[in-house]
């Protein structure tokens, strides 16, 4: 009898272990099945390092990539070079997080039916970018290393996200043998992945921080004699601007003014503004993760002054600063940026972007004031004529 009881208990324990294992697998399947199927090493989904998923179009319907059989890029060499940092190359030197992020929709995967949807036709994806705008932006950059980004702050659509230097994926130059420096950092997507010392554009963040904290108005004045000492550190300006208001200081990009303003504001309020505006942390956008850093935790008074001018250890991505510009334009809030507009298969929409907003990051009054200050800088300092129809 005891032997039967022991066997029964053993069988029960085994059944419990089996049930627990099955449950654990089901949970893992529910959570991770899409990742298993779209894993970059899967021969069912990838050819080499490239997703085999369909056709990619720009916002106008111009086809810029066909991945149904290898990789067929645009017939326009300039468009190929202008979009390779978004679409990736054939060898994985330039990755395509955008396509990887939507691999599940592109290949037709479903947790219930698996890859059966893949047999129902090729996926078509429409991006928010304009191939023509990408091409024009890359041509305008010329030999400069950098990025150009344009987005609709009302909808979130990224119209342009181009990186220079670049290359034609159908005619790859001898990058490894280049000794001119022309291709330095060519594999880097400078719009999403590169964080830059922002310099004087950060003065808008300092202005926003001061206005929001009621620490200063746009009429607050400081006197610039070309240099000053703050916290034992010398702050040098490009000229002797005399007594300036905040509006005038932004137009003249006065380092002395903004050093004094940042020091008076203090590191806690400047840090809080950078945090709130999304300039100290990450921003995820359709597979990309942009990272900016404004860390004043160890900053003394002089370092805070330099941080307010966009120096010290400030590092900001183009995407995150562009979003901040959208917040100003949108009266204190803006749409979150995105790249993928729509994915369809066999006449059915399997993904469509929805506009999401940042929430109110600035008061409407502060946003209006900042917009007016920026407009004043264009009209009174740089000249509206230089910006053509944009003004």
Residue ranges of model-derived segments:
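Periplasmic/cell-envelope proteins involved in peptidoglycan metabolism and beta-lactam response
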Residues: 1-176, 186, 195, 268-276
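Beta-lactam-recognizing serine transpeptidase/beta-lactamase-like catalytic domain environment
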Residues: 60, 154-199, 205-391
């Amino acid at each position: 009898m005891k032997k039967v009881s022991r066997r029964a208990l053993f069988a029960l324990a085994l059944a419990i272990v089996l049930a627990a294992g099955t449950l654990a697998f089901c949970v893992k399947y529910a959570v991770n099945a899409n990742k298993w199927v779209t894993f970059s090493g899967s021969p069912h989904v990838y050819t080499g390092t490239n997703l085999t998923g369909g056709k990619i179009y720009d916002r106008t319907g111009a086809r810029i990539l066909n991945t149904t059989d290898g990789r067929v890029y645009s017939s326009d060499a300039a468009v190929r070079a202008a979009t390779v940092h978004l679409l990736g190359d054939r060898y994985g030197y330039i990755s395509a997080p955008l396509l990887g992020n939507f691999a599940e929709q592109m290949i037709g995967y479903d947790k219930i039916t698996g890859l059966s949807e893949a047999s129902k036709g090729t996926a078509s994806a429409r991006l928010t970018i304009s191939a023509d705008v990408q091409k024009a932006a890359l041509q305008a950059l010329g030999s400069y290393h950098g990025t150009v980004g344009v987005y609709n702050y009302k909808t979130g659509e990224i119209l342009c996200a181009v990186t220079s230097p670049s290359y034609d994926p159908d005619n790859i130059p001898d990058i490894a043998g280049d000794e001119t420096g022309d291709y330095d950092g060519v594999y880097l997507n400078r719009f999403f992945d590169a964080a830059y010392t922002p310099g004087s554009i950060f003065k808008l963040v300092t202005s926003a921080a001061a206005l929001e904290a009621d620490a200063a108005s746009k009429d607050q004045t400081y006197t610039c004699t070309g240099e000053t000492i703050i916290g034992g550190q010398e702050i040098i300006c490009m000229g002797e601007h005399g007594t300036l208001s905040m509006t005038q200081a932004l137009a003249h990009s006065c380092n002395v003014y903004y050093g004094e303003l940042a020091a008076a504001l203090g590191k806690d309020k400047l840090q809080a503004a950078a945090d709130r505006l999304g300039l100290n942390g990450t921003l995820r956008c359709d597979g990309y993760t942009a990272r900016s850093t404004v860390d004043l935790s160890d900053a003394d008074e002089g370092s805070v002054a330099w941080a307010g001018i966009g120096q010290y250890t400030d590092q900001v991505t183009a995407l995150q600063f562009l979003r901040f510009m959208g917040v100003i334009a949108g009266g204190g809030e803006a749409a979150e940026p995105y790249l993928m507009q729509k994915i369809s298969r066999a006449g059915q929409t399997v993904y469509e972007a929805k506009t999401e907003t940042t929430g109110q990051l600035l008061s409407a009054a502060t946003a209006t004031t900042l917009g007016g200050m920026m407009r004043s800088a264009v009209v009174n300092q740089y000249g509206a004529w230089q910006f053509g129809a944009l003004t």
